[in-house]
């Protein structure tokens, strides 16, 4: 079966949920394909989502990091969704709330069967903090591929940018093919075609291809 191209510009807001338990209440079960976006509260997650979907306000950007406490779900089509997870690791958030978020993030990564890939966004100037590594480890332990996206790459000169990209790739090399590392700039559009190509591939996991092949053969 030929792999179709997903038009990420068609993404539209579906629901918000305070945690994974409520997510199951709002969505039609743990089915279809989900791609999650996770990152520290200042990693530029909302800006990246808006740039990738070419929508200025699909994901609301906040001038106060740590404000996004909800899981926000955006629908690509009847089978595919983008999931904007709460930002983590912001110092001004109360410890109890911070721990609750981190527990919810871990639950989502470990228990969500329809999760096809995770984009872990990191400011290219401050990559691989402890919580970033924890997110990557959780995902890989659950056999979920990861795209480590180094955001705000326009903030560095080309030589410094590639030096950081290579250092991060080396640091994550033990994860093998489970983790890809790419630079990205929401402002300049740097890396956008590569990221969309990876997301498109994740939108077509093998189980879905097999399911569609079976449906085609029965018609």
UniProtKB/Swiss-Prot annotation:
GO terms for molecular function: GTP binding; metal ion binding. GO terms for biological process: division septum assembly. Residues 31-205 form the EngB-type G domain. It holds the Pfam family MMR_HSR1. PROSITE patterns: G_ENGB (PS51706). Its cofactor is Mg(2+). GTP binds at residues 39-46, 66-70, 84-87, 151-154, 184-186. The keyword Signal does not apply. The keyword Transcription does not apply. Mg(2+) binds at residues 46, 68. GO terms for cellular component: cytosol. Keywords: Cell cycle, Cell division, GTP-binding, Magnesium, Metal-binding, Nucleotide-binding, Septation. It comes from the Bacteria. Belongs to the TRAFAC class TrmE-Era-EngA-EngB-Septin-like GTPase superfamily. EngB GTPase family. Necessary for normal cell division and for the maintenance of normal septation. PANTHER family: ENGB-TYPE G DOMAIN-CONTAINING PROTEIN (PTHR11649:SF13), MSS1/TRME-RELATED GTP-BINDING PROTEIN (PTHR11649). This is Probable GTP-binding protein EngB. It comes from Shewanella sp. (strain W3-18-1). The lineage of its organism: Bacteria, Pseudomonadati, Pseudomonadota, Gammaproteobacteria, Alteromonadales.
């Amino acid at each position: 079966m030929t792999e179709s191209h997903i038009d990420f510009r068609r993404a539209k807001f579906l629901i918000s949920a305070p945690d994974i338990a409520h997510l199951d209440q709002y969505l039609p079960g743990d089915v279809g394909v989900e791609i999650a976006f996770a990152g520290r509260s200042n990693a530029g997650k909302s800006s990246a989502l808006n740039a990738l979907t070419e929508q200025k306000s699909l994901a609301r950007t906040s001038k106060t990091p740590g404000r996004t406490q909800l899981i926000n779900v955006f629908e690509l089509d009847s089978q595919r969704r983008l999931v904007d997870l709460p930002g983590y690791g912001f110092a001004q958030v109360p410890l109890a709330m911070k721990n609750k978020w981190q527990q919810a993030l871990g639950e989502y990564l470990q228990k969500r069967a329809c999760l096809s890939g995770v984009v872990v966004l990191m400011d290219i100037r401050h990559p691989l903090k402890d919580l970033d590594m924890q997110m990557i480890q959780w995902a890989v332990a659950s056999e979920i591929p990861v795209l480590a996206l180094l955001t705000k790459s326009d903030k560095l000169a080309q030589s410094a940018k590639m030096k950081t990209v290579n250092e991060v790739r080396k640091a994550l090399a033990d994860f093998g093919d489970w983790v890809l590392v790419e630079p990205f700039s929401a402002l300049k559009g740097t890396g956008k075609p590569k990221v969309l190509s990876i997301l498109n591939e994740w939108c077509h996991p093998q189980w879905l291809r097999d399911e569609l092949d079976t449906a085609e053969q029965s018609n």
